[in-house]
Amino acid sequence: GMYMSGFFPCMMFGIPGAALAMIQTAKTNKRKATIGIVGSAAVCAFLCGVTEPFEFSFMFLAFPLYVVYALLYAIFATVTVALGYRAGFCFSAGLTDAIFSSFLPAANKTLLLIPMGIAAFVVFYLVFLFAIKKFNLKTPGREDDQEGELNIELANDDYTAMAQIILEGLGGKDNI
């Protein structure tokens, strides 16, 4: 559990902090979509410890930010070992494994997860916020607008027009 312990504060608290930074820096016309993508990925990471939806949302758009993200994981892994927090996991470091692993005989100082988690949330949030703004990183919701993208409204009742747009996006009738 010693080397697994560092994942808990990062997955359960750090990722939601980073997600909040991404949501706040998203363009206003893309904020709802960003909340849906990044927010649901953060909930998934917190509850289950499944981080891939969150990581894949930005690792190809802003690779330098992914490097920073990996370094934050390393820092928090070091801190958890130094503080003596011990918790293992069966699947991944989400809430479900945090609850179950806290009852294992090898678990140690399990309540430290709360203050470490709060610290991880704040650190991930501030680092992501700074990096995204300072280096104008293209995280979800900040990517360049495509021509014609702004003309599409999701609440459009003209289903024929929507079907035509979807058909064009799939390569036309001949492609289907």
Kindly give the residue locations of the regions a language model identified.
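Transmembrane alpha-helical segments and their short flanking loops
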Residues: 1-3, 15-24, 40-41, 47-156
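Short linear motifs at secondary-structure transitions and domain/linker junctions
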Residues: 20, 33-34, 44-45, 163-166
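A broadly tuned "polar low-complexity/structure-edge" signature
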Residues: 36-41, 176
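Structured cytosolic domains appended to multi-pass membrane proteins
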Residues: 157-175
